[in-house]
Amino acid sequence: MRSARWFVALGCAALLHGQGAVPCSCGANPPGPPRTRESRPYAQAPADLRPFANFTEPYYENYTKTVEYNGAAREAPMVKPEEVTEVRIGFLGPVEDHPDQKLGRMMLHGAELAIEEANQSGGYGGKPFRLMIHNDQAVWGASSNEIVKMAYDEKVWAMFGSISGDSTHIALRVSLKAEVPIVNSAATDPTIPETIIPWYLTTLQDDRVQSYTLARRIYSDLGLRKIALLRVNDRYGRFGVLKFKDASRRLGHPVLIEQKYMPGSTDFRRQLEIIGDSGADGVVIWGDSGPAGNILKQMRAAGMKQPVFGSFRVVGDDLLATAGEAADGLEAVYPFDPTRDDPMWAAFRQRFEKRYNVQPEVFASLAYDTMTILLQAICRGGLNRGHIRDALAGVETFKGVTGEMVFDPNSKNVVPLYLAKVHNGKYEFRRYPMQAPYARVGENGVQYHGPAVDNAGAGPIPIALFGPRAEEIAARLAPQAPGYRVVPVPSEVPWGQASTKLVKVIWDDHALAMIATDRNSSHLAEQLAVKAFVPMIALSEDRALTSTNIPWILRLPKETDPAEALRRVLDAAARSGPNRAALREQLIGGNP
């Protein structure tokens, strides 16, 4: 397939927001420049993880506004469908003779399927899209030659790729010179969009988001302190761990030790012995799923019991097959939830498996969505690179087969990641934002210096649930809390009546914690929390709740499911025991 050109005939349609075929507009009403937007903080980074946040605004605060394009590409004549025989899109990816060729071929299949389905719906005014495939050899000179061929010789209307961060950087420079849009679904280098080149869109959350999410889970949520890094010795591993090391240092727990392995390695005993001797209480793997499976297997065989975490490329069926029971407990970040009940996702999986006899994984799925976004932009913008660029830059949200995407003004998908956890040989997924998981105890970090708090008594331990529809919610949550009793206190009744019942649950029944499900309930319950020394999780956006120097109030976003708040209470209680003060320390990420 060396430098092959694959042509897929038939016709095309944009899939409007990824939800169904509609006729391609063929640039009938090309969009103008996108509206000016501003989104702070950059990449949604929490304050305690942003560099120099205590001293000055980080340099990347300059990236919070829409990147302007003031060139002349929009002035080029619009090419009509009857003037072309095909609409070319360039593809750059490692599809042969490359360590990442398995990933590159899956990425190609996802992009290819999107084009085939678009062509089956009529093409661009009856003319088919054609994918011009070029192999990314991850050698700067060779890759740059392929990119130049696409932009100038083949005259593609847009480019797609690559996985390699260095090749993508080169492609971006060519796109600036040639004024050709480029979309990406696989490169995680956060510096790529920071070039302020206005021709780029990416759908995969970058290393910054992945690192901050892992750091939040490891340090703030689980309370681990001494982390060892085990990474692949290539650009993906080398660049990937930089942001995690930065986040670890900012949270007060610099990485204890960093070990490397060469691509293709299968024996990790030397690195694991060094990590074991270091006293690390957790391990982060930054690499691919195949080696990660061997690492887990060899760790457990050596008697190492530390929890293990990973970057998104750690997740894969081959890890489960290789590691077996040793994989249980692994947690890794992931862009979406492939186990969710979503008809759109299920239909895509069926179509993909029928076409390629294999289930789509992350590279194929994101490539399909990314190519769909590009096809929509071409249909809206027409055959004019400047207008295609405007259409891409104007994308703010998108619903695809992988779920919802939200793009910042820099055309990066910044939707929160998922945590994939292995349990009984299967992956379980849940959304996990990189913001402080329990907000903060006081916006400036309030401490508790009061008297010692007694343990809860014997029997099922009460947890108060206060807010609208409390009885209905408590009934739903009860099966999730064995050994505990979720006590509902409805807020729809008169406040005096609600307060009386809440006092009884807190003082007489000795509830271990409270969950207040809305703003009003949170404000009513906060005085009880401080007087009774009981931790309370408030589901509210009202910062005043955590700005009153009350060390018992913790805050989660108002849209948080009460089940998630309960889960966090139970997870913390499993480490703290039935003691309110110890529970509070665990909830805010204190020492285990």
Regions found by a protein language model. Give the residues of each.
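Extracytosolic ligand-binding ectodomains
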Residues: 10-12, 20-592
